[in-house]
UniProtKB/Swiss-Prot annotation:
Family (UniProt): Belongs to the DadA oxidoreductase family.
Binding-site residues, FAD: 3-17
Flavoprotein among keywords: yes
GO CC annotations on file: cytoplasm; plasma membrane
EC number, UniProt record: 1.4.99.-
Protein name: D-amino acid dehydrogenase
Known pathway: Amino-acid degradation; D-alanine degradation; NH(3) and pyruvate from D-alanine: step 1/1
Annotated source species: Ectopseudomonas mendocina (strain ymp) (Pseudomonas mendocina)
HAMAP family xref list: DadA
Cross-referenced NCBIfam families: PRK00711.1
Lineage: Bacteria, Pseudomonadati, Pseudomonadota, Gammaproteobacteria, Pseudomonadales
Reaction equation(s) it catalyzes: a D-alpha-amino acid + A + H2O = a 2-oxocarboxylate + AH2 + NH4(+)
Alphabetical list of InterPro entries matching this protein: DadA, FAD-dep_OxRdtase, FAD/NAD-bd_sf
Protein purpose: Oxidative deamination of D-amino acids.
């Protein structure tokens, strides 16, 4: 079966790889000159299934009001006049209930845990190297209120069977020795020992090479113009003035996916959440992170690669603006200097921004659509790296009429539209 994949970020590349492993003829098309040159280029570097949580959570509306008044806030909103922006925010607010949070988090953790297992299997089978570490993730709490608020997340972790550890100040310093000098600033931490880290762009580039070895064709520098539909099927995709045809089509264009879907009458509530990162050269390895930490106050992750520290976070709801805001750099530098003052040279840091494709409920859109040969793999928000392998493998199974290893319940676009045309003959999943 010939499959045309639109997008060569970590999601599109993983989709292509797993489709090729099943024997399909795969072509990947992207406007960039290589894989992982947009959102996947310089993210925070975390593969953190246990921290897979929706931004839409109880208490977030009140927190958001406070954040908007803070200098180093994790969230900023810039009105664009775009109706989609207001609709997306309204949908997000509707998901800020305890009941919806629990449902959405379970879906996210389910896919993220599976994806981590797929990554482990891939690494064991192929030896793919991407400066990865399997040393866990530590969420730092600066206040007792944050420690107490973690109870709802711990309940979900327990229900999902995800191992975790609650740490006091001294235990934090044992896990991350470089934090010993600043432990007085911390009230506690939640550690997930099974979480991982790695350079997403490096991983995607190497996975693309592995996909090519399986016969996948990558076409870079291509202008994807529109989808062409006849009845309930796609007839092809117009690319640089030419209609490209296939048996199945996968849309993995992140924040840009809705633009192609709207003319078909498909509304995918995916909106860009602008994020920022710093890549800092390490000057003192003993004073740098051992693995990765997440500062709960600022929603910023600090991750160790081989000779670099990646600091990533923030969420700006500002449309498709890709300008670099110096105030965000100031925030990232402040947090890094506060926790790891001797770890790296901030004066030599590389500043970057990207657009995370976010859904209002936090769960990505993976699966079939009302068009029988069109499949979506988009809307992963801040968790594209975490969910990439699992999303790609799940989608390949759905396209190939294979039995998925996890339940796909609640992952496709039908949860928004009420329409679902997944493969009618698809068998029930083995693993729930």
């Amino acid at each position: 079966m010939r499959v045309l994949v639109l997008g060569s970020g970590v999601i599109g590349t993983a989709s292509a790889y797993y489709l090729a492993r099943q024997g399909h003829e795969v072509v990947v098309v992207d406007r960039q000159n290589g894989p992982a040159l947009e959102t996947s280029f310089a993210n925070a570097g975390q593969v953190s299934p246990g921290y897979a949580s929706p931004w839409a959570a109880p208490g977030v509306p009140l927190k958001a009001i406070k954040w908007l008044l803070q200098k180093h806030a994790p969230l900023a909103i810039k009105a664009t006049g775009d109706v989609d922006q207001y609709l997306w925010m309204a949908q997000m607010l509707r998901n800020c209930t305890a009941a919806r949070y629990a449902v959405n988090k379970e879906r996210m953790v389910r896919l993220s845990e599976y994806s981590r297992d797929c990554l482990d299997e891939l690494r064991a089978e192929t030896g793919i190297a991407y400066e990865g570490r399997q040393l866990g993730t530590t969420q730092l709490f600066r206040t007792q209120a944050q420690v107490d608020a973690a109870a709802k997340d711990i309940a979900v972790l327990e229900a999902s069977g995800v191992p975790f550890e609650l740490l006091d100040r001294d235990a934090i310093a044992r896990v991350e020795p470089a934090l010993a000098g600043v432990k007085h600033k911390l009230a506690g931490a939640l550690r997930l020992p099974n979480d991982q880290t790695g350079d997403c762009q490096m991983f995607t580039t190497k996975l693309a090479d592995m996909a090519k070895a399986l016969g996948v064709e990558f076409r870079f520098g291509q202008n994807i113009q529109r989808l062409d539909a006849v009845g309930d099927r796609l007839n092809g995709v117009w690319i640089d003035g030419k209609l490209e045809t296939a048996d199945r089509y996968v849309l993995a264009l992140g924040s840009y996916s809705p633009q192609l879907l709207k003319p078909l009458g498909v509304r995918a509530p995916v909106y860009p959440l602008k994020g920022y990162s710093l890549t800092v050269p390490i000057t003192n390895a003993e004073m740098a992170p051992t693995s990765t930490i997440l500062d709960e106050t600022y929603k910023v992750a600090i991750t160790r690669f081989d000779n670099r520290i990646r600091v990533g976070g923030m969420a700006e709801i500002a449309g498709f603006d890709l300008s670099l805001n110096p105030r965000r750099r100031e925030t990232l530098e402040m947090i890094t200097a506060d926790l790891y003052p001797q770890g790296g040279d901030l004066s030599q840091a590389e500043f970057w921004t990207g657009l995370r494709p976010a859904t209002p409920d936090g769960t990505p859109i993976v699966g079939a659509t009302a068009y029988r040969n069109l499949f979506l793999n988009t809307g992963h928000g801040t968790l594209g790296w975490t969910m990439a392998c699992g999303s790609g493998r799940l989608l390949a199974d759905l396209i190939g009429s294979k039995r998925p290893q996890i339940s796909a319940e609640g992952l496709d676009i039908s949860r928004y539209s009420g329409k679902n045309r997944e493969l009618e003959a698809a068998p029930q999943p083995l693993r729930t």
